Amino acid sequence: MTDMLGDWKRSHLCGTLTKADVGKQVTLMGWVMRRRDHGGLIFIDLRDREGLAQIVFDPAKAPEAHREAEAVRNEYVVAIKGEVVPRPEGTVNPNMKTGEVEILVTQCKLLNRSKALPFTLDDYVDVAENLRLKHRYLDLRRTPLQQNLILRSRVSQVTRQYLTENGFLEIETPFLTKSTPEGARDFLVPSRINQGNFYALPQSPQIFKQILMISGFDRYFQVVRCFRDEDLRADRQPEFTQIDCELSFVDRDDVIAVMEGLIARIFKEAKEIDVQLPIPRMTYAEAIRRYGVDNPDVRFGLELVELTDIVKGSGFKVFADVAAGGGIIKGLNAKGCARFSRKEIDDLTEFVKIYGAKGLAYVKIEGGEWHSPIAKFFTAQEIADMNRAFGAEEGDLLLFVADKPKVVNDSLGKLRNQLAQILGLVDKGTFKFVWITDFPLLEWDEEEKRWAAVHHPFTAPMDEDLDKVESDPGACRAKAYDLVLNGNEIGGGSIRIHQQHIQSLMFRMLGLSEEEARAKFGFLLDALEFGTPPHGGIAFGMDRLIMLLTGSDSIRDVIAFPKTQKGACLMSDAPSPVDSKQLRELAIKVTVKQ
């Protein structure tokens, strides 16, 4: 039998009691974390979201409560009444918030029992993640996950407070919207009333927040769910949360200034970390040149070295041919890594092949000389010039990739991060931000043989590049900006196109006919004709931001009910088949690919 709660009222949360509470009569309720029977006295660690309290059952003082405690097991739900007393000398636990006190029980109620657990609820559990996700209600009782979600809630509160103080209005935008397939696939929702037609779940509130600016609301924000039906990676979810903002009558610097204030407030109030403002900025071109990627981790050096001009006339045919064909040659100096074995270098070679590189040339600096199969192809002057470019010293390992610029930058940029992990160059306790600006407006899609928007079709070109949009699309820069933290893009935004003729031009550049643009975006094109203010905004990825703030290894550890990499919720068994009657009401017939 279990007891009913009756008229008992909780007086305190378990993890909040301190020496200041000694002598108080308290009522606590929670889960039994562990039970210890010391041959008379029974000790229970009682847990709630605030932490643990040590509960003492003394048969001499409360025999009935002691009998109840004898039957208690882990994860039973109990309520106790008792007095807060100091722990005996020598038993104080400095690792617990409540470690100086314990509660001497006078009464106890067993509110509910628990089955045997499929896994322990320790801070670190060595168990398959799928088992944890299947029993997510148990997994979420673990302290690390509870702390993650408590911090997430705090970040949401701080965000709303800061943005409201700065004149933003929280306005909801629709979840049932029009499908405008650009980029990732939409999640589609069939309409029962308008059979054969579908809503789409929003990939972002982009167009609606722009229309709110056209409507004169000046500053908008939303902590909003977004949906993308794409192949999932470890750091992606089909549904995710954005801190979404839009501002009228602003330029890039205005948006960045307000958003830096938000980031600084979040880090200060959530983690007691002071973010140095202003955050450094770097152009896209500089990021690619120095780091190979547009989301560089600037906590460490290991920058890419441009070598094309030095080696284009060399006797090493691989390098010379690549340079002659319009490719580039770049390298990395892995300081002190001449000790690497052939197998370790082979592993690095296989790693860069993942990103399209055909191979990885290497040189070891030993005894003041080059040791490498390629050393014989270079003159003494070329070797001296490369040593100077690399800053090469005794014991260094020089690594080279030669290919098309995108392949070279991608592969070396990823190799840079990999080497930083191997060599322990990353200080995991530091947070380093950088804004990336001046992105290309358009990029050529080789598969579809057309131009594609680097960010999205509503990003404005730089004023000075506007006359090149048609004549030289690849040279046009966008009024776009990303915020990168420790090598992770946590926010992206831009100044938007606010003139209809430029928006129509952008759609044409993306290969949309006037009819297609009207069919997909007609309501935006119409709105742009009615006095649209200059405006811009940004969206921060809440899930990734919380993952970095908490030092979590997986984005699934900062979401209450995440999906697997196959898009499934193992706890609720979604997605699942639906009743045939529901399908008939929607005029839908299901055909499953074999």
Curated annotation (Swiss-Prot):
The keyword Isomerase does not apply. It catalyses: tRNA(Asx) + L-aspartate + ATP = L-aspartyl-tRNA(Asx) + AMP + diphosphate. GO terms for biological process: aspartyl-tRNA aminoacylation. Its EC number is 6.1.1.23. Gene3D superfamilies: Bira Bifunctional Protein, Domain 2 (3.30.930.10), GAD-like domain (3.30.1360.30), Nucleic acid-binding proteins (2.40.50.140). InterPro entries: Aa-tRNA-synt_II, aa-tRNA-synth_II, aa-tRNA-synth_II/BPL/LPL, Asp-tRNA-ligase_1, Asp-tRNA-ligase_1_N, Asp/Asn-tRNA-synth_IIb, AspRS_core, GAD-like_sf. The keyword Transcription regulation does not apply. Residues 206-209 are annotated as: Aspartate. One of its GO terms (cellular component) is cytoplasm. It is an enzyme of class 6 (ligase). It holds the Pfam family tRNA-synt_2. It is found in: Cytoplasm. Aspartyl-tRNA synthetase with relaxed tRNA specificity since it is able to aspartylate not only its cognate tRNA(Asp) but also tRNA(Asn). Reaction proceeds in two steps: L-aspartate is first activated by ATP to form Asp-AMP and then transferred to the acceptor end of tRNA(Asp/Asn). NCBIfam families: aspS_bact, PRK00476.1. PANTHER family: ASPARTATE--TRNA LIGASE, MITOCHONDRIAL (PTHR22594:SF5), ASPARTYL/LYSYL-TRNA SYNTHETASE (PTHR22594). Homodimer. This is Aspartate--tRNA(Asp/Asn) ligase. It comes from Geobacter sulfurreducens (strain ATCC 51573 / DSM 12127 / PCA).
